[in-house]
């Protein structure tokens, strides 16, 4: 039975990097069949899996060749490192239309063709901290059953994570979606791990893994590869392997209890981040 996971978080927090490295570790170390469906108009959710290749998006194919062309997987799906399948929703031309509609259209086509069913895990890498419209589709319509939020010990990252939890609460009962935990993508902020653990405790979830900051992530990206592909023996590759293992074995799924803005600020102040 395929497990569908949506990765959310503040813009620039490292969602795409975390998703691709975790997917690579899942396939390489844990022999899972993995697919990544990028839900960002930038279409950069699968680039490192494909060795730097920017693949043709579903919306580009739809615009240029029509819906029938989207039904041909050779046009819209690529296979990369460890046979990870890659699809990018894409979006409209800049300044025209709604990118969220592209997500809805792309997911609907993939479901119609039953593409997701041939995998153990499908990751939806979703644009920024947006919880409205098409970008909320994985939450709103139960397209993903599990949500993981990438955060750090910075105020805006926590603010975005808390807002995402508010969006989840709104749709959780109707869609069945649940929060699997917070992934800390460390920024080396003082007291970061303790702050994230406190935040998780307050909203009723777990910090599923603390991913330390390591320059090898940027080095691998510069070489257009994931860390696992670049150097599977390095310590950071094993951090992603641990994160992958914890996701595979996770059975702690909750409807979160978001904090008020006052509570969030009070907590952050107590850790000295707003001094």
Curated annotation (Swiss-Prot):
Binds 1 [4Fe-4S] cluster per dimer. One of its GO terms (molecular function) is metal ion binding. GO terms for biological process: nitrogen fixation. CDD domains: NifH. Pfam families: Fer4_NifH. Gene3D superfamilies: P-loop containing nucleotide triphosphate hydrolases. [4Fe-4S] cluster binds at residues 98, 132. Its cofactor is [4Fe-4S] cluster. Keywords: 4Fe-4S, ADP-ribosylation, ATP-binding, Iron, Iron-sulfur, Metal-binding, Nitrogen fixation, Nucleotide-binding, Oxidoreductase. ATP binds at residues 9-16. The modification ADP-ribosylarginine is found at residue 101. It is an enzyme of class 1 (oxidoreductase). Its EC number is 1.18.6.1. The keyword Protein biosynthesis does not apply. It catalyses: N2 + 8 reduced [2Fe-2S]-[ferredoxin] + 16 ATP + 16 H2O = H2 + 8 oxidized [2Fe-2S]-[ferredoxin] + 2 NH4(+) + 16 ADP + 16 phosphate + 6 H(+). The key enzymatic reactions in nitrogen fixation are catalyzed by the nitrogenase complex, which has 2 components: the iron protein and the molybdenum-iron protein. HAMAP family: NifH. This is Nitrogenase iron protein 1.
């Amino acid at each position: 039975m395929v497990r569908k996971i949506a990765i959310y978080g503040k813009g620039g927090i490292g969602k795409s990097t975390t998703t691709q490295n975790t997917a690579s570790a899942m396939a390489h170390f844990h022999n899972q069949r993995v697919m990544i469906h990028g839900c960002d108009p930038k279409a950069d959710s699968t680039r490192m899996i494909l060795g730097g290749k920017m693949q043709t998006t579903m919306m580009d194919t739809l615009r240029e060749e029509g819906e029938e062309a989207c039904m041909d997987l050779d046009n819209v799906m690529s296979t990369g490192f460890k046979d990870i399948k890659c699809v990018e929703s894409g979006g409209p031309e800049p300044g025209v239309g709604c990118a969220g509609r592209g997500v809805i259209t792309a997911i609907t086509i993939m479901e119609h063709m039953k593409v997701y069913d041939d995998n153990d895990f499908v990751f939806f890498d979703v644009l920024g901290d947006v919880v409205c419209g098409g970008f909320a589709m994985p939450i709103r319509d139960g397209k993903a059953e599990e949500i993981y939020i990438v955060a750090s010990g910075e105020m805006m990252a926590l603010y975005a994570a808390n807002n995402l939890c508010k969006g989840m609460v709104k749709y959780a009962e109707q869609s069945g979606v649940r929060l699997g935990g917070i992934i800390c993508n460390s920024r080396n902020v003082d007291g970061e791990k303790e702050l994230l653990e406190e935040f998780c405790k307050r909203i009723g979830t777990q910090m599923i893994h603390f991913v330390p900051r390591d320059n090898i992530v940027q080095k691998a990206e510069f070489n257009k590869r994931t860390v696992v592909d670049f150097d599977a023996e390095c310590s950071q590759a094993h951090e992603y392997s641990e994160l992958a293992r914890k996701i595979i074995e996770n059975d702690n799924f909750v409807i979160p209890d978001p904090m008020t803005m006052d509570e969030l600020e009070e907590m952050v102040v107590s850790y000295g981040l707003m001094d």
